[in-house]
Amino acid sequence: MRPSGREADQLRPLKITRNFTKHAEGSVLIECGDTKVICTATVVSGVPRFLKGKGQGWITAEYGMLPRSTHSRMDREAARGKQGGRTVEIQRLIGRSLRAAVDLKKLGENTITIDCDVIQADGGTRTASITGGFVALADAMRVLVENKKVKENPIVSQIAAISVGVYKGVPVLDLDYPEDSNAETDMNVIMNDKGGFIEIQGTAEGEAFSDEHMMGMLAVARKGIAEIMEAQRAALFDK
């Protein structure tokens, strides 16, 4: 039995609220159970130096957690004077994942920054950031099209992400913090709407996982991501 009482392949309640803030070209509050993340998409003209003159755009991401998003207060990274390794790893993952959704040539020489701010953490913050970040990105692309900054929408794939793991010997979907902190294996899976894998990050905690467990985790991930993509589409078509 999972601590939450959910079935092995059951997602936490998922809610995606668009237009959560008024200034950004795209903004979303994503709630995955008790994990809550604000994702905003900001469009600026121009690209990083390494892309100048190449006729393509860029998508990057930043990630952070509010000091009391967790059980005990943590210092802001700005107060420490540098980002931690975990933060850098997560924002690179978000950026890579969302670039896989876009034809960067069609974006032109524009840069979109996805800011992911965790206001409450209960497991799965990086996957929630990717899922919510995609919706914010899609809204930003609509703004570019409406303002005739691009000729056509550069999005070519829908992207979503989920955490899976092995908990008490069973592959389970969408780990919350009590499960994540006690899982034998935890894995993050990012997929597109064509059934392709963008990235898989998996780690065994103390004991190696088997082929059977691997296939079980991927099976529940596929099911969960299909449901998440339905929620993304429902949010995007809700005017």
Swiss-Prot record:
State which Enzyme Commission number(s) the record gives.
2.7.7.56
PROSITE patterns in alphabetical order: RIBONUCLEASE_PH
> Pfam families, from UniProt?
RNase_PH (PF01138), RNase_PH_C (PF03725)
Q: Its catalytic activity?
A: tRNA(n+1) + phosphate = tRNA(n) + a ribonucleoside 5'-diphosphate
User: What InterPro entries would the database entry show?
Assistant: ExoRNase_PH_dom1, ExoRNase_PH_dom2, ExoRNase_PH_dom2_sf, PNPase/RNase_PH_dom_sf, Ribosomal_Su5_D2-typ_SF, RNase_PH, RNase_PH_bac-type, RNase_PH_CS
Q: Which SUPFAM superfamilies match?
A: Ribonuclease PH domain 2-like (SSF55666), Ribosomal protein S5 domain 2-like (SSF54211)
- Please provide, alphabetically and separated by semicolons, the GO molecular function terms listed in this UniProt record: 3'-5'-RNA exonuclease activity; tRNA binding; tRNA nucleotidyltransferase activity
Q: Could you tell me the superkingdom of the organism this chain comes from?
A: Bacteria
Q: Which UniProt keywords apply?
A: Nucleotidyltransferase, RNA-binding, rRNA processing, Transferase, tRNA processing, tRNA-binding
Look at the named UniProt entry and state the broad enzyme category this protein falls under. transferase
Checking CDD domains in the record gives: RNase_PH_bact (cd11362)
Q: One of this protein's GO BP terms?
A: rRNA processing
Which residues are involved in binding phosphate? R86, G124, T125, R126
- Partners and quaternary state? Homohexameric ring arranged as a trimer of dimers.
Physiological role:
Phosphorolytic 3'-5' exoribonuclease that plays an important role in tRNA 3'-end maturation. Removes nucleotide residues following the 3'-CCA terminus of tRNAs; can also add nucleotides to the ends of RNA molecules by using nucleoside diphosphates as substrates, but this may not be physiologically important. Probably plays a role in initiation of 16S rRNA degradation (leading to ribosome degradation) during starvation.
In the record, the note on similarity to other proteins reads: Belongs to the RNase PH family.
Know the name of this protein? Ribonuclease PH
Which species does the entry assign this protein to? Marinomonas sp. (strain MWYL1)
